[in-house]
């Protein structure tokens, strides 16, 4: 049996199966949420799924230890791309200048690349300097991620800035950082970031979203409109939902903003059409995917593989929690997409790249002859 065949057969097939199932569900969900509009988003989403699968397979088969020499250059390149969004090349959508226009391809969101390459860089640093004093670990980790975090916050993309928090906490904790340092880091970080966010990082519409989250009745026809309509839509889905592509739904009638129903509010469309059952099936599938990722982390051959796997898993978990949470008023609206489900090529490919790395950690958990 050749090494290639052995790698293919030795993949984490629970991870592969759940990721593929979510990708297919994503195309169906995007179709059902946008088919009554002129834009054929599901066609583009299907193309990105194919591209993501190719990236996943290639990344899975290559030994993940290539990040030892490529992580930092890729991270620096992603920071440069984020900086380019501040130039004429940057493109604004929904009040945030987060995208670059690539001729013939479409838009590209560099912050998505910055997070995943940041995970690789921090993982490499922590694995190489495990015995470094905890305070120095915090300082150097802050130096690594501080620049891109501020750049992303200034765009402003509050959601992508928040993603760094669970990612860094999980990686530092597994690297052996004492809990007292983590608690101090959280307190100091919140003490510094909170006033900066209010004064410089958040635009008026983002502040109104937070107010609407605290009190949905404060502006029911304005900033709280979307979340209130999302709750109505999901609630009206009941136990079994109104049915696939059902007529007369909140989504079809345009009560959910047409620019976000296939992205930020994709779970709303799923909840209305497929009800409580559909929501539970989707969340359960994500749970299986995340457990498969954690099992790969448990079987990692070295600390680099462990840290990469846990960091990417934390990123995916936070996206799932935040996206679904904001549609049912458990979290404020931030615009974070639902992994593999929401429309968007950059994020889908980056998630598949991350899952490919996790699968590579599993495949190469033992030295192959």
Where are the regions a protein language model picked out?
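N-terminal membrane topogenic signal
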Residues: 1-20
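A juxtamembrane structural motif centered on a specific transmembrane helix
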Residues: 1-2, 30, 319-369
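Helix-boundary and loop/linker segments of multi-pass membrane transporters
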Residues: 7-9, 138, 254-257, 300-301
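Hydrophobic alpha-helical transmembrane segments of multi-pass inner membrane proteins, especially
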Residues: 16-228, 268-328, 353-357
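Glycine/serine-rich anion-binding loops at beta->alpha junctions
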Residues: 104-114, 154-156, 238, 242-243, ...
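Re-entrant/interfacial helical elements at transmembrane boundaries that shape
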Residues: 164, 245-253, 285, 327-335, ...
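Extracytosolic (periplasmic/ER-lumenal) interhelical loops and adjacent juxtamembrane/interface segments
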Residues: 226-245
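Long extracytoplasmic/lumenal interhelical loops at the membrane interface
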Residues: 239-274
């Amino acid at each position: 049996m050749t090494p290639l065949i052995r790698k293919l057969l030795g993949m984490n097939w629970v991870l592969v199966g759940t990721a593929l199932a979510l990708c297919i569900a994503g195309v169906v969900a995007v179709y059902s949420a946008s088919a009554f509009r002129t834009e054929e988003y599901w066609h583009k989403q299907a193309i990105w799924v194919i591209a993501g699968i190719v990236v996943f397979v290639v990344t899975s088969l290559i030994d993940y230890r290539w990040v030892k020499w490529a992580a930092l250059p890729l991270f620096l390149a992603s920071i440069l791309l984020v900086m380019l969004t501040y130039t004429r090349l940057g493109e604004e959508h929904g009040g945030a200048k987060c995208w670059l226009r690539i001729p013939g391809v479409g838009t590209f969101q560099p912050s998505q690349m910055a997070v995943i390459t940041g995970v690789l860089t921090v993982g490499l640093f922590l694995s190489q300097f495990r015995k470094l004093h905890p305070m120095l670990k915090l300082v150097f980790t802050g130096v690594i991620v501080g620049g891109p975090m501020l750049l992303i916050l200034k765009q402003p993309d509050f959601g992508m800035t928040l993603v760094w928090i669970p990612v860094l906490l999980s990686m530092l904790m597994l690297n052996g950082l004492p809990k007292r340092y983590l608690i101090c880091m959280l307190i100091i970080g919140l003490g510094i970031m909170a006033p900066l966010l209010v004064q410089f990082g958040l635009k008026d519409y983002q502040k109104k979203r937070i107010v609407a989250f605290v009190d949905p009745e404060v502006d029911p026809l304005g900033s709280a409109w979307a979340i209130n309509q999302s709750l109505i839509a999901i609630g009206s889905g009941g136990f079994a939902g109104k049915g696939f592509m059902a007529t007369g739904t909140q989504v079809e009638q345009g009560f959910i903003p047409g620019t976000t129903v296939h992205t930020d509010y994709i779970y709303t469309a799923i909840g209305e059409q497929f009800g409580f059952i559909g929501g539970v099936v989707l969340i359960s599938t994500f749970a299986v995917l995340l457990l498969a990722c954690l099992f790969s982390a448990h079987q990692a051959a070295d600390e680099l593989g462990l840290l990469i796997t846990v960091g990417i898993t934390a990123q995916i978990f936070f996206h799932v929690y935040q996206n679904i949470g904001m549609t049912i008023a458990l979290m404020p609206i931030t615009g974070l997409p639902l992994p593999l489900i929401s429309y968007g090529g950059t994020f889908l490919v980056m998630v598949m790249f991350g899952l490919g790395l996790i699968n590579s950690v599993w495949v190469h958990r033992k030295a192959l002859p």
